[in-house]
């Protein structure tokens, strides 16, 4: 069986880890970074992911997609999505099924399809490190993700060519990373997770009895549309307003300027975590009839804190709810762990520390803890990590719509999963032949105030007065937090079973089509890599041949030199094209044409072997030259990758 990797699929950055012996290890990507920006760019002929996508964002803002996690599993008409429609430089559209999709380079794409590009990058990063194919993963999601968002994340994994062995909640993963090597007794930990686009709070009890550790989630709460992106947007709007006051020009109408502003705001926010003042200086940000305009604004830490004060306060409300749900007070919490890049902001740390009345743990890396925890869970699933039991919960209540548009709950929020529950219902009318089971998720009594997860019909009910037929509805939540529902007519035994896919969401056929599309692109990528390798080998051969011609000097006959130069010209022409076979053929012909050069080089080497003193000097030079050629060839090859 291959290795199972752990992936933190983040809003702003993503991270991949694997169990290395008994320790989880974060894997560096091809650029040498431990985290990868969750940014995807679509150009006319390729898809860029991570740093390469981020670097070109300023010149290609409408086709560069970021924070796609904020859209995954969401409806286009959702208030949160509509807010993003107004501020994102890329185009967010409504799909035929009502989902929020993205349009780039004239192509309409579902969020799972775009997220799959990030997962493919994580998969490749792990494969390069392990030296073997990776087909299985544990992927993390915000604890407060609903069923649609979890299902969409699993779809993204499938499209990326990964079997998602488990969906695990981010705060739970962070607690695993923190607690796996701490074998003390009972410990109640609060995990405050403020990432790029989502916020979660989980209260987790870590028990260690007779060498077995139990991680039990007591309560969870959060906001799936609150994170670092919102903090950035406050600063972006402030800078745009300041510029408008000074220049009477609104940068919000200029996508290129807004992309530069976004990068500058993000950089300024990070700088203000370690300094009390910074300056945003963007020359030539835009221009009008009077000439170019420059943006220069000084920002203090106090100013930034005033801009985001309500966002920080907003994150404290779920803490109170989670504590109440767990039936605990602040004094019952032993440790507080901060996860997510936005928790590096001093004001956030100060407010959380003040809320819990205790010092925060400093030994957890907020960017890597979640991926490490996912790798630990992967180890549990593969049997490499023993004596660890993880008991997670469902974040929201689940039920069905009953008479009077009331939501009747079958499973309460914060119930440990996996779990099952069933309840018997009846018909509302005489001789009713079918019932519609409308599945809901949320805490409101009125059905319309909750998230609709989908509906299905149970037909063929025998005619009977209202209230007589007995229909058993059973809910079954698996370890991923995904819901399976069945309805059975107790008299006839007729049953209808479904795995809940949101009333929106992607069908199996759509996911399969996207998988095939991804596989087709994988073939294209492999062919492109082979082409680059052939070009690099050809360039290396030409470079080495030119050096040998110089070294041969007058010993190389003019007609041979002419033949070799013609072969080199053919190689140059071939490498400008995209025909791998033509490049390889031209390279082979150059090798054959250079046979005279090889003879001269061998004769020189034999002559040098006869020298008793200083024989090594010329030979060393030749070897040094060879080494230079090899090293340069390897470097070019790596660079192209």
UniProtKB/Swiss-Prot annotation:
GO molecular function terms listed in the Swiss-Prot or TrEMBL record: ATP binding; ATP-dependent protein folding chaperone; unfolded protein binding
Residues in the signal sequence: none
Residue segments, region Disordered: 601-641
InterPro entries noted in UniProt: ATPase_NBD, Chaperone_DnaK, Heat_shock_70_CS, HSP70_C_sf, HSP70_peptide-bd_sf, Hsp_70_fam
Regulation: induction: By stress conditions e.g. heat shock.
Residues annotated with Phosphothreonine modification: 198
Low complexity composition-biased segments: 601-622
Record's keyword annotation contains Phosphoprotein: yes
Record keyword DNA damage present: no
Top-rank taxon: Bacteria
PROSITE patterns xrefs: HSP70_1, HSP70_2, HSP70_3
Keyword terms, alphabetized: ATP-binding, Chaperone, Nucleotide-binding, Phosphoprotein, Stress response
Positions of transmembrane segments: none
Biased composition (Acidic residues): 627-641
Matches recorded under CDD domains: ASKHA_NBD_HSP70_DnaK-like
Protein family: Belongs to the heat shock protein 70 family.
Function: Acts as a chaperone.
Name of protein: Chaperone protein DnaK
Source organism: Shewanella piezotolerans (strain WP3 / JCM 13877)
Gene name of the record: dnaK
